[in-house]
Regions:
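Charged, structured surface patches that assemble and position nucleic-acid processing machinery
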Residues: 1-128, 134-135, 139, 143-147, ...
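Conserved catalytic cores of phosphodiester-cleaving nucleases, focusing on short active-site segments
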Residues: 145, 160-162, 168-177
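Short, well-structured beta-strand/strand-turn elements
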Residues: 148-160
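Residue-level marker of positions within ordered structural domains that often coincide
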Residues: 150, 176, 216
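Glycine-rich nucleotide-phosphate-binding loops and adjacent flexible coil segments
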Residues: 180
Length: 441
């Protein structure tokens, strides 16, 4: 995949988001919903997600021992505490999205599918038996239609039949694990729709085919995590992957005119990190490929489909508001600062562009050892803030080479106390972008 060369404005505020407690509450609502329909969740992955979030809420993400909860996970992608947290968020946020739609409308035939999604491995990245996650994707798409006010059926041969007024959409869902499977699965979905859309005309009723495709693993073969410098950058990284996939499928003849298959809905569902400001996210990104041969004659149907996604309200009244990123730090009287006497050597190592990639590739033990290597600290009103080698590497990785070189030269001068103070303040603002001085009162 080509590397993005665009520029993005620096973030000034954080994204709104949900707390760990809110996500635990979502799982509890799901548990009650499932139990109310006779579906047991004890000792299932739902139960384990709840146990993880409960400990994370009470003791902090860094103090959870996930291997005691997810005992069968030995994959190398699950090393650091943040890895586990992001993978859990991916699962919980998708389940919460499904529940949100089912609270609006419960489709016929949903119970059999709900029983299936409770099973499966704990994480999609590790799921070798794809049935559970395939059905979960069907329910993810179903939720959009439920939220948009459609009457939905899941009790037919078609994955989803969604109706609004006289418009009926026959939707086949496919999760594709690599680009080689794109053509096979798209053509299979086409044949399924052609076989299942009613051929007998009914007065005032119109039927359309839609193909929904989860291409997460096509874009990201590891089915893991993604990363962005800012929120705009993170969004564009995923959208770029979707555009690349849409170009690959242009030559595949998966559309039809009669019955009309009018749209292919590509979606990526992936968790990740935003660097500035530091924040975790789960992203559901979509791109829609339209059958140009039917775009005019099926304009009303396409407008309905557009409203399914564009018109959906994904806001949550529980979201904590965005916060302004601090650009200055006022040090009160009595503030204490310290910096390693070897800071010049540490800066030389941390300023190497290879250092950032090297740290990300470290094993859990190596990562922890680097995290324990302190380069400096500040004590404000008796509260201690330490900065590790990882903090220094992450800070310098965001700065241009000229800035890093000049900073190293200034630090090499033993009497440049101002430069040392500036470095500590910049490290503080990098690590604590939303610092509130009143919290130290």
């Amino acid at each position: 995949m080509t590397e993005l060369q665009n520029s993005y404005p620096a973030a000034t505020h954080s994204l709104p988001g949900l707390s760990i407690d809110d996500r635990f509450s979502d799982l509890e609502s799901l548990r009650l919903f499932l139990n109310g329909r006779g579906i047991e969740t004890k000792n299932t992955r739902i139960d384990r997600y709840q146990k993880y979030l409960k400990i994370a809420s009470d003791q902090g993400v860094d103090n959870v021992d996930p291997k005691r909860i997810f005992k069968n996970v030995t994959d190398g992608r699950f090393q650091h505490g943040l890895d586990w947290y992001l993978y859990v968020l991916r699962e919980v946020d998708e389940l919460a999205h499904i529940l949100k739609g089912l609270k609006v409308h419960v489709p016929g035939g949903v119970d059999e599918r709900l029983k299936k999604i409770v099973g499966g491995s704990d994480f999609a990245a590790l799921d070798k038996n794809s049935e559970s996650r395939n059905i979960q994707f069907e329910l993810r798409i179903t939720s959009y239609f439920c939220l948009a006010g459609f009457l939905v059926r899941l009790d037919t041969e078609t994955d989803i039949v969604a109706s609004k007024g006289r418009q009926h959409f026959y939707i086949e869902c496919k999760r594709i694990s690599n680009s080689k499977q794109l053509e096979e699965n798209l053509l299979k979905a086409k044949q399924q729709i052609l076989a299942r859309v009613p051929t007998k005309k009914r007065i005032l009723h119109k039927y359309y085919g839609v193909i929904a495709v989860d291409v997460t693993r096509v874009a990201y073969s590891h089915n893991g995590l993604t990363f962005g410098i800012t929120n705009d950058h993170a969004r564009e990284v995923v959208q770029s992957a979707l555009r690349s996939i849409s170009e690959k499928i242009e030559r595949i003849k998966f559309f039809s005119k009669k019955p009309p298959i009018i749209q292919c809905w590509l979606q990526i569902h992936i968790p990740g990190l935003i660097e500035s400001p530091p924040q975790a996210f789960t992203r559901f990104s979509s791109l829609f490929v339209v059958n140009l041969e039917t775009a005019i004659s099926c304009r009303a149907a396409l407008l309905l489909l557009n409203n399914v996604y564009a018109g959906a309200d994904f806001s949550d009244p529980r979201e904590f508001p965005s916060r302004k990123i601090n650009t200055e730090l006022n040090l009160p009287a009595g503030t204490q600062l310290w910096l390693s006497p070897n800071i010049s050597d540490l800066m030389f190592t941390a300023g190497d562009p290879k250092s950032f990639k090297s740290i990300n590739a470290k094993s859990a033990d190596d990562f922890d050892n680097i995290a324990k290597t302190l380069v400096g600290g500040i004590i404000i009103k008796g509260k201690k803030y330490d900065f590790s080698m990882i903090d220094l590497v992450a800070f310098l990785a965001k700065k241009p080479d000229g800035f890093v070189k000049q900073l190293c030269e200034r630090l090499a001068e033993d009497d440049d106390l101002k430069c040392r103070t500036e470095l500590l303040c910049m490290l503080f603002l990098s690590k604590y972008p939303f610092y509130d001085s009143s919290s130290d009162e």
